Amino acid sequence: SEWKSLANSDWTPTFDSLRNPQKAELIQSLLREQHGICCYCEQSISEKTLHIEHLVPQSVDATKALEYRNMACSCIRNTPQNTNLHCGHKRENWYDSDYISPLEEDCESHFSFSWDGTIRPNDCTDNRAVNMIQHLALNHVVLNEKRKAALDPIIDLQMTKEQMILYAQKVTQQNSNGMYNPGFPSLFRDLIL
């Protein structure tokens, strides 16, 4: 970006020195690419509820700190003390070169969901999926409750199979702003489509 090109012998751009308007532009771009969902759990997020996640943590490889393809938006902007965390804030600096990157074309194929909102590896021998679920706390009670709540309209309305398919097709399509609402598109694709 233009901001990085300002580097000189007296100043080197760093992620910590990234400020608005460049940081806001970066967030908007990532959020558009992710269609308004967390890169890990797929819940709906906004500029006010996200943080920028480094897929390869800065502590592992500082040279990738400003690489666009190494950044994604993860849920939970602020982390109050004693909070049970999930996704990027739970992951912290954990990194395994064999982990499932949210940028992988087929990343969602590694996971399956249950109607109670829980997530599991699609194949119980898939250690990559097991590690992601564990290290990111993707079965955190808060996430399970949110996924279950996303399914509640189907359950509450006692939809027929055809109605469920129509509903799932609707919520797995991006809205006019290019965002998923209510989020969790993989949940609906796995259970219904």
Segments (PLM) and residue ranges:
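Long, low-complexity, intrinsically disordered segments enriched in glycines and aromatic residues
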Residues: 82-141
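C-terminal, charged low-complexity interaction regions
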Residues: 124-193
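Histidine-centered nuclease catalytic patch
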Residues: 40-89, 93-94
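Short, well-structured alpha-helical interface segments that form or flank functional binding sites
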Residues: 25, 33-36, 47-50, 66, ...
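Catalytic cores of phosphodiester-bond-cleaving enzymes
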Residues: 2-9, 15-17, 24, 101, ...
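Short, charged surface segments at domain edges that flank catalytic/cofactor-binding sites
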Residues: 1-37, 61-66
